[in-house]
A protein has these predicted regions:
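Compositionally biased terminal segments of proteins
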Residues: 1-130
Length: 130
């Protein structure tokens, strides 16, 4: 898979470069999720959902909001989750850069900074809010 070519397609459709990169990162994560054992245990939330419903470029978002159902949010579990997504034979790997705790008024979660890298070493930085 060539991430740069996918970015170029979205850019030609009118997305700004950073939004095109974010969209490709989201597409990769969603594809990997849909083909993983976690597909029935994760809810996609936030701007990704709104953008896909409205198809409005104004709704484009940089991060991906996920809600894990009956899955631990400790760092080892998050590393295992990403490791499982990386088992797909798509020549795209997700590398965790950093994990930080999130404390919101109604819940605690994690922000996972990741780098999505293709076989040509083209990469996109994004983050997952879990």
């Amino acid at each position: 898979m060539n991430l740069e070519k996918f970015v170029e397609i979205y850019y030609k459709q009118g997305y700004e470069l950073n939004s095109a990169q974010a969209k490709v990162a989201q597409d990769i994560i969603l594809l990997k999720l849909s083909e993983s054992k976690y597909k029935d245990n994760i809810t996609i939330k936030g701007g990704v959902v709104m953008h896909n419903i409205s198809h409005s470029m104004r709704r484009a978002t940089r991060d991906i909001d996920l809600d894990f159902i009956k899955y631990s949010l400790d760092n080892n579990s998050i590393y295992n989750f990403i490791e499982t997504l990386n088992k797909m034979n798509d020549n795209v790997q997700i590398q965790i850069e950093k994990i930080i705790a999130l404390k919101h008024e109604d819940y605690n979660g994690k922000r996972v900074y990741v780098k999505i890298i293709d076989k040509y070493n083209y990469y996109i930085d994004t983050k997952l809010d879990i």
